[in-house]
Amino acid sequence: MNKLTIIVTYYNAEEYITGCLESIKQQRTQDFNLIIVNDGSTDQSKKLMDEAIKDYDKNIRFIDLDENSGHAHARNIALEEVETPYFMFLDADDELASYAITFYLEKFNNTDGLIAPIHSFTTQRPQFVDLDRVRVEYFNAKENINSFLRKQSACNIIFRTAIVRAHHIRFNENLNTYVDWSFVLEYMKYVNKFVRIFNFPFYFRGEVYDPFETLTLSEQNFDILFKDYVNSFYDAIKRATNPKVREFIVTKMGNKIANEFEPTRYDINERYQTHKDTLVELSKFLHVHLVKNQKLINKIETILLMNNETDKAFKVNQFRKTLRHVKNIVLRRKNKERSLYDLTDKEDNVKPKTIVFESFGGKNYSDSPKYIYEYMQKYYPNYRYIWSFKNPDKNVVPGSAEKVKRNSAEYYQAYSEASHWVSNARTPLYLNKKENQTYIQTWHGTPLKRLANDMKVVRMPGTTTPKYKRNFNRETSRWDYLISPNRYSTEIFRSAFWMDEERILEIGYPRNDVLVNRANDQEYLDEIRTHLNLPSDKKVIMYAPTWRDDEFVSKGKYLFELKIDLDNLYKELGDDYVILLRMHYLISNALDLSGYENFAIDVSNYNDVSELFLISDCLITDYSSVMFDYGILKRPQFFFAYDIDKYDKGLRGFYMNYMEDLPGPIYTEPYGLAKELKNLDKVQQQYQEKIDAFYDRFCSVDNGKASQYIGDLIHKDIKEQ
């Protein structure tokens, strides 16, 4: 007979149920029973569950509930079916490490409970237990009983069935989300000895794919969560008889209030107003604990709440933030300029004739913001123009524009005063876009790879899928206008960026005006070639690959390994061609072109990619949006997609049919590519029909007047203010 039962309850968990069950199937010991409860799912969860266990050689107890009643009820139903001496819960959106059950059974030693850590989602998971890292300790219940409560979860705890049955312990079905303490607190009363595991992962939380729809606890709506947390707190206090346990629960509640009503939260005003009555009630209940452990300014806020003076309490809450900023300024800390901005930014600061521009986070003077600025500088010279740069001294801006250094006092002043912001990438969320400011987002390419809300998973440093999507959503909510180059992009932007179509301007990219207006301006083209010191008798190949989400070295910096085989290209093409290498702006590593000085040129830091398009006889790319801009010229394109399987399926995925819709041949190895590059005219003729179709679908909106459209729009807006 097995000693342990694993209980899995699920409701509409189609994104996770397969991974959860696979983690059970992959346990290195199968000496356990399994109970699976379908809590009235209405999606494809049951079908996927059936598929996942169809070849699983285990006698599973299935329970199907007619309607969703919450996981407290589902777990209580499952408890009636447990036939083993011990049991544990595994949430359907979580997974067990393959070594977990083996290790648990080895260490349990017939105690009354085993507590193992719960880790956040990660793709980097160990395959074996590191015995030098893991720590196992046995406790008497009187010593460290609060261990059961630390994660506020009943998952990854092994319970003794006899204790639960003898004392009829059940989950409180009147609670919605924070139901676990109701069960664990009752169970703790009867524990004598237990074992706790430290310092090594055994249980992983599932990844959140859609933070706006997910049922995952940490990502649910705050208003609903906080209300249920408070209800669970009062329920827990009633159940807790041990003074140490009560103190632990009270401390948890105090920390919860401090964290959720932290003055710097962007939605603190809304939170405070919505939950002010609850805060009053909690302050009265917790006043001894809170006042004892708080700083003076926090105590004043608590006392005001106790006296039901919520408006004054909120002012004190915000004064706490003010004090921090003042401290940063007085002590001249590195973020003192930002603190000054937060303290002084207000709508009255806005000056109608001031426009601030930024391109690629201040990297250079380039892209659509450049062309909008140059149009406005020519036709509306009396406005005040400001450009934001990481390194202002390294960027030359024609005309009268002021240059400011990112995160300097002048930078914050510019964003506080400008009536219009123009950027081609996201701006920091700590910049406060006020009601009387207009934010024009030009964006920086027709999308091929999935973006933001359309990405199932995000594999970027310094963030998680839900955090990335929530922050992106906050950013796009500030955009008053988003420029789209075509109908294809408009449809994608609506979904990926949570945009309503009224805010989308389908006018083509301002940066592409030059491709329409100057493609046949030979004098202009010769100037560009001369500036780059290109030989006049050689054709120009441009190689512009994208960055890979998973090849990062740090936040915002990515590596790129040149797979195109320059040596072979040089041998095949060196007599008649030069190649321009244009890395994505997020690529941080410099290219080593030693030995190819007369053949390969790194133009990654050349500010204007449109000028490079104009002098290139053909383009090599992979999954970069440059293909859409270059398509305006109707010249040959080659697609070097050496990692197509990984990129299409494992990373972001594509919006279009990559294998069918491209205006040129696809190569997965460099040698065939090198040979085909010798025959540009042949490729042009062979793919002319696809080149024309590609142009009609993605490039035909670009008419050379997008910069004028935006410049005139800003001018009109200023005149009407």
Swiss-Prot record:
One of its GO terms (molecular function) is CDP-glycerol glycerophosphotransferase activity. Responsible for the polymerization of the main chain of the major teichoic acid by sequential transfer of glycerol phosphate units from CDP-glycerol to the disaccharide linkage unit. Synthesizes polymers of approximately 35 glycerol phosphate units in length. It comes from the Bacteria. SUPFAM superfamilies: Nucleotide-diphospho-sugar transferases (SSF53448), UDP-Glycosyltransferase/glycogen phosphorylase (SSF53756). Gene3D superfamilies: 3.40.50.11820, 3.40.50.12580, Spore Coat Polysaccharide Biosynthesis Protein SpsA, Chain A. Its EC number is 2.7.8.12. It catalyses: 4-O-[(2R)-glycerylphospho]-N-acetyl-beta-D-mannosaminyl-(1->4)-N-acetyl-alpha-D-glucosaminyl di-trans,octa-cis-undecaprenyl diphosphate + n CDP-glycerol = 4-O-{[(2R)-1-glycerylphospho](n)-(2R)-1-glycerylphospho}-N-acetyl-beta-D-mannosaminyl-(1->4)-N-acetyl-alpha-D-glucosaminyl undecaprenyl diphosphate + n CMP + n H(+). Pathway: Cell wall biogenesis; poly(glycerol phosphate) teichoic acid biosynthesis. InterPro entries: Glycerophosphate_synth, Glyco_trans_2-like, Nucleotide-diphossugar_trans, TagF_C, TagF_N, Teichoic_Acid_Biosynth. One of its GO terms (cellular component) is plasma membrane. It comes from Staphylococcus epidermidis (strain ATCC 35984 / DSM 28319 / BCRC 17069 / CCUG 31568 / BM 3577 / RP62A). The keyword Transferase applies. This is Teichoic acid poly(glycerol phosphate) polymerase.
